[in-house]
Regions:
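A short, Trp-centered hydrophobic/proline-enriched beta-strand micro-motif
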Residues: 171-184
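N-terminal-proximal low-complexity accessory segments that begin disordered
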Residues: 30-76
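Beta-sandwich/jelly-roll carbohydrate-recognition scaffolds of carbohydrate-active enzymes
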Residues: 162-164, 187-200
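A short core secondary-structure module
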Residues: 214, 218-225
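Internal helix-loop-helix
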Residues: 78-174
Length: 225
């Protein structure tokens, strides 16, 4: 069993509740994002505090260094419209066609199409299109939350399904916190003055493995919902 060391919190529950409320409000009111133009428009006016080279960015959508990455994500929507067999899937939760990046794979064929979609997007963009982390996360969490509930009688899986369903109905981009905080990049993880800038095993007991450390969101979260 993997456990979190009580002295370090890897998830901020207050922030999670606020985000959950926003998602619920957005998905009840707005129609799903389907096109590249709709996606780009959805990123405006979010009042994010984004700093680039020490300067506050007023509107990330219009920044010349950020916009190319937004255009790459937008291509994931454009591909879904041009080639729905490759870029979309039918959700078992909504019964509707959704962007494949929001789909929980249910078969080997799903995984094959997922890989072909990623390969095609790589050919089209020549860069990172920033949705793989979110897609991989929901597929991993689908299994992990089910196993946790089966072992401990908790309700994580149902809440996870509710979250994914909201994201699918809204057509949102899901980001991920996957990057270690790094600290002094000239030093290896075990050489850091603060070991918690990298996620690491802090102790092992008969009950399981305990972990400590920080994860930071990827840069692509600027372009996520």
């Amino acid at each position: 069993m993997l456990q979190q060391d009580s002295s370090v919190c890897l998830f901020w529950h207050g922030t999670h509740r606020s985000a959950q409320t926003i998602f619920r409000s957005e998905t009840e009111v707005n129609s799903p994002i389907r096109s590249a133009d709709e996606y780009i428009a959805s990123l405006r006016g979010r009042k994010l505090r984004v700093f680039l080279f020490g300067e506050l960015v007023d509107e990330p959508v219009d920044h010349p260094l950020i916009r190319p990455s937004i255009n790459a994500v937008a291509e994931t929507y454009a591909l879904a419209l041009r080639n729905p067999e490759l870029g979309t899937a039918v959700s078992p939760y909504t019964g509707e066609r959704i962007n494949r990046f929001l789909h929980v794979a249910g078969s080997a064929q799903d995984l094959v199409l997922q890989n072909k979609m990623q390969r095609r997007l790589g050919q089209l963009t020549g860069t990172c299109f920033q949705r793989c982390v979110g897609m991989d996360a929901i597929n991993a969490l689908h299994s992990v939350t089910f196993d946790i509930d089966a072992a401990h009688g908790t309700g994580y899986h149902r809440r996870f399904i509710d979250f994914v369903t909201q994201m699918q109905r809204a057509g949102f981009v899901i980001g991920g916190a996957m990057t270690d905080a790094k600290g002094d990049r000239s030093k290896a993880p075990h050489e850091q003055a603060d070991p918690d800038v990298f996620v690491h095993v802090s102790r092992r007991t008969d009950e399981g493995v305990y972990i400590r450390g920080a994860k930071a969101h990827q840069t692509g979260c600027i372009n996520s919902h």
